[in-house]
Amino acid sequence: MTIKLIVGLANPGAEYAATRHNAGAWFVDLLAERLRAPLREEAKFFGYTSRVTLGGEDVRLLVPTTFMNLSGKAVAAMASFFRINPDEILVVHDELDLPPGVAKFKLGGGHGGHNGLKDIISKLGNNPNFHRLRIGIGHPGDKNKVVGFVLGKPPVSEQKLIDEAIDEAVRCTEMWFTDGLTKATNRLHAFKAQ
């Protein structure tokens, strides 16, 4: 099994660029930058895309330009065009249940209330069995404050932790392609930015 598509979830537009909900896009932006593979807008895939080589494998990158709750439209378009199965997709998203400075890989599972994941599961034919990379953003402590929280910008101290976790997650994703998922997972799950 190899990953053929890495998706970073986000809302489009400058007003959302620095918000917690866009942590997935921050990851893909950094990965594309590291691999010198600039993202370009591609209308037929409803997003910014690039093509990279990881561990000798051809991998597509995608940051949807749809709103978060329509992310599945972009993912399904690209998966269908390149004949990519759900278990060959890695979706990178912000995670309320992990603190800033932590990131974790996961295969399958529910959407945990995340509207981007919810739409992707739906558009992939109700198939939740894709890989996820969960970027911790913390929780506001009150479920009624979640929307404002994910659409807010983290303070500098939290942003630093999130950025460090993303940096480590990029390294571990590259390691996945060279040394396998188990080794990459063990390293990433032991990491906590201070």
From Swiss-Prot:
Protein origin, superkingdom: Bacteria
Assigned keywords, A-Z: Cytoplasm, Hydrolase, RNA-binding, tRNA-binding
Active site: 21 (proton acceptor)
Recorded GO CC terms: cytoplasm
Compartmental location: Cytoplasm
Entry's Gene Ontology BP terms: protein quality control for misfolded or incompletely synthesized proteins; rescue of stalled ribosome
PROSITE patterns, sorted: PEPT_TRNA_HYDROL_1, PEPT_TRNA_HYDROL_2
The EC number(s) this enzyme carries: 3.1.1.29
Record's keyword annotation contains Cytoplasm: yes
Record-annotated site: Stabilizes the basic form of H active site to accept a proton: 94
Site positions for Discriminates between blocked and unblocked aminoacyl-tRNA: 11
Residues reported to bind tRNA: 16, 67, 69, 115
Molecular function terms, GO-annotated: peptidyl-tRNA hydrolase activity; tRNA binding
Enzymatic reactions: an N-acyl-L-alpha-aminoacyl-tRNA + H2O = an N-acyl-L-amino acid + a tRNA + H(+)
Chief location bin: cytoplasm
Function according to Swiss-Prot or TrEMBL: Hydrolyzes ribosome-free peptidyl-tRNAs (with 1 or more amino acids incorporated), which drop off the ribosome during protein synthesis, or as a result of ribosome stalling. Catalyzes the release of premature peptidyl moieties from peptidyl-tRNA molecules trapped in stalled 50S ribosomal subunits, and thus maintains levels of free tRNAs and 50S ribosomes.
Family, per entry: Belongs to the PTH family.
Subunit-level organization: Monomer.
Protein name, entry field: Peptidyl-tRNA hydrolase
Organism: Shigella dysenteriae serotype 1 (strain Sd197)
